UniProtKB/Swiss-Prot annotation:
Catalytic activity: S-ubiquitinyl-[E2 ubiquitin-conjugating enzyme]-L-cysteine + [acceptor protein]-L-lysine = [E2 ubiquitin-conjugating enzyme]-L-cysteine + N(6)-ubiquitinyl-[acceptor protein]-L-lysine
Function text: E3 ubiquitin ligase that catalyzes 'Lys63'-linked polyubiquitination of target protein, enhancing protein-protein interaction and cell signaling. Transfers ubiquitin from E2 ubiquitin-conjugating enzyme UBE2V1-UBE2N to substrate protein. Essential adapter molecule in IL17A-mediated signaling. Upon IL17A stimulation, interacts with IL17RA and IL17RC receptor chains through SEFIR domains and catalyzes 'Lys63'-linked polyubiquitination of TRAF6, leading to TRAF6-mediated activation of NF-kappa-B and MAPkinase pathways.
Result when mutating residue 286 to G: Impairs IL17A-mediated signaling
Identification of the protein by name: E3 ubiquitin ligase TRAF3IP2
Ranges of compositional bias, category Basic and acidic residues: 112-123
InterPro entries: E3_ubiq_ligase_TRAF3IP2, SEFIR_dom
The organism of origin for this protein: Mus musculus
EC number in record: 2.3.2.27
Molecular functions (GO terms): signaling receptor binding; ubiquitin protein ligase activity
Self-association and partners: Interacts with IKBKG/NF-kappa B essential modulator, with CHUK/IKK-alpha and with IKBKB/IKK-beta. Interacts with TRAF6; this interaction is direct. Interacts with IL17RA and IL17RC. Interacts with IL17RB.
EC top class, as a word: transferase
PANTHER family tied to this protein: ADAPTER PROTEIN CIKS, E3 UBIQUITIN LIGASE TRAF3IP2
Length: 555
């Protein structure tokens, strides 16, 4: 009895899945296999394929002509829509005309069921070519391409549901996808838009060290000899430096000179030699020229005491009073020694000593060491250990120097002296003015500073009738008499009175009995005033050496 295979067509799908289902091929071996027992309790499995008796080849009826035409039309529409979406693949397929023309030539000679099988194989070959040509090899490569036709997917899904799966057979390995190729997605430009504005930032400059001419390393040299003399005696001290300075280095002198030869800046990306930082060199002294502060060898001079006071008023005048350093050369000058007509090759300066060409060369560039900030102060720094009871100072003055005396008191207070003045102790002084003045006059440990001015001379030597209305002048006259009595009682020797000439005062304004002592000027002699209050001498005598050896020559 002949059987016919009914075909169900699902019109809801875009492509009928049942029409794309390939017809199973039957072999004589399958006819000899007995049918598997049909057990009701057995769970349905994908491997249990033969649940119904297989169709014999003798009982097989060909598919109707209408179904075959419908299948061919669906396949043609699927291929046409696929090549419209992927036109580049159509060119690749056309190039392989030798391999693709053979199945097409055989379609007319084969039966309809075999023609469909060859068409399905061709579609599978197109799918493998599409997977190999796909440029997406990233983490989303396992996802299906939305542009693929649904006919292929429906054909495979329908085939797995309605027909048994073939057994895996050993065969040639399928064509694998191309290996991962670096694309723009793996670089710094993978972001479509620069959110943080990184591309607009300037590229960083090379790391350099900010140093000045005085901070450059140099060889150890003597401060008592000219550098040119030491270069002749010790030629190994000369440092070989690169010939071309870097125009971008902040220590380069030409970087700050608008008219210099290196005024133009090198664009970013050019190489900068690492040794360009040490290109800043100075010219050695010419023969016969001695650096400032340099002296010939001989006995050491008498050492001088240098004070380090920290007065606010002294900040403006300290460079002129205490700065004994060498005059520094300006940073915008670059010196080179005379070449004497012979110039060394530039590339030889960067080579090691054993690879440099031998022969007469120009003297190499040498960096002159930075002179000390205070070369004359070669003694040992020490702090004065003046006891607290010897730091008391009392000042007597007239009203014409009141404002200047306040600055002078501030100078003494900053330097550690307990200075007493009637302006700062007016409340205590108001209890008993005479007793307040005598407390400082009778204490022999208190140093008394006399502020000399034209008004002071008038107050101490004028008639008392002229001071009736000036109470401060009367107190100044009383203090002057007490000091004069002490001076006479000490045998006309001055132990603690320090006359200081304030502005607009001359030495003729000093009282007669004080002219036989040291008279200082403010603010010119502030250092000497501090030394006098510290009971220290300005110059310290050198240590005593041994007696000379005498050579006795007999007659």
């Amino acid at each position: 009895m002949n059987r016919s295979i009914p075909v169900e067509v699902d019109e809801s799908e875009p492509f009928p899945s049942q029409l794309l289902k390939p017809i199973p091929e039957y072999s004589p071996e399958e006819e000899l296999e007995p049918p598997a027992p049909n057990t009701r309790n057995m769970a349905p499995s994908s491997l249990s394929v033969l649940q119904c008796p297989p169709l014999k080849l003798a009982n097989h009826q060909p598919v109707s002509q209408q179904v075959t035409c419908l299948r061919a039309k669906v396949l043609e529409e699927g291929e046409a829509s696929f090549f419209r979406r992927h036109p580049e693949l159509g060119k690749d397929i056309s190039s392989c005309s030798s391999g693709a023309s053979e199945p097409e030539s055989e379609l007319g000679a084969l039966p309809p069921e075999h023609r469909f099988t060859l068409t399905e194989k061709r579609n599978r070959w197109l799918g493998s070519q599409l997977s190999a040509a796909s440029p997406d090899t990233g983490h989303e490569s396992d996802k299906s391409d939305p542009s693929l036709p649904n006919a292929l997917a429906d054909s495979f899904s329908g085939g797995q549901e309605m027909m048994p799966r073939p057994r895996p057979r050993p065969g040639p390995h399928r064509h694998r996808a191309a290996p991962d190729v670096p694309t723009i997605d793996t670089g710094y430009d993978s972001q479509p838009q620069d959110v943080l504005g990184i591309r607009q930032l300037e590229r960083p400059l090379p790391l350099t060290s900010s140093c000045y001419l005085q901070d450059l390393p140099g060889p150890l040299r003597s401060r008592e000899l000219p550098p040119q003399f030491e270069l002749e005696r010790y030629p190994m001290n000369a440092q070989l430096l690169p010939p071309h300075p870097s125009p971008q280095a902040p220590w380069n002198c030409q970087y700050y000179c608008p008219g210099g030869p290196y005024h133009h800046q090198v664009p970013h990306g050019h190489g900068y030699p690492p040794a360009a930082a040490y290109q800043q060199v100075l010219q050695p002294a010419l023969p016969g020229q001695v650096l400032p502060g340099a002296r010939a060898r001989g006995p050491r001079p008498v050492q001088k005491v240098i004070l380090n006071d920290s007065s606010p008023q002294d900040q403006e005048e300290r460079p002129a009073q205490r700065d004994f350093s060498f005059p520094r050369l300006p940073r915008d000058q670059l010196y080179r020694p005379p070449s004497n007509g012979v110039e060394a090759p530039e590339e030889s300066l960067d080579l090691p000593a054993e690879l440099r060409p031998h022969g007469p060369q120009a003297p190499s560039l040498a960096a002159v060491p930075r002179p000390p900030s205070n070369p004359l102060a070669r003694g040992t720094l020490r702090t004065s250990n003046l006891p607290e009871e010897l730091r008391k100072v009392f000042i007597t003055y007239s009203m014409d120097t009141a404002m200047e005396v306040v600055k002078f008191v501030n100078f003494l207070l900053v330097n550690g002296f307990q200075t007493a003045i009637d302006i700062f102790e007016d409340r205590i002084r108001g209890i008993d003015i005479i007793k307040w003045m005598e407390r400082y006059l009778r204490d022999k440990t208190v140093m008394i500073i006399v502020a000399i001015s034209p008004k002071y001379k008038q107050d101490v030597e004028g008639a008392e009738s002229q001071l009736d209305e000036d109470e401060h002048g009367l107190h100044t006259k009383y203090i002057h008499r007490m000091m004069q009595i002490e001076f006479i009682s000490q045998g006309s020797m001055n132990f603690r009175f320090i006359p200081v000439l304030f502005p607009n005062a001359k030495k003729e304004h000093v009282p007669t009995w004080l002219q036989n002592t040291h008279v200082y000027s403010w603010p010119k002699n502030k250092k000497n005033i501090l030394l006098r209050l510290l009971r220290e001498e300005e110059y310290v005598a050198p240590p005593r050496g041994p007696l000379p050896t005498l050579q006795v020559v007999p007659l």
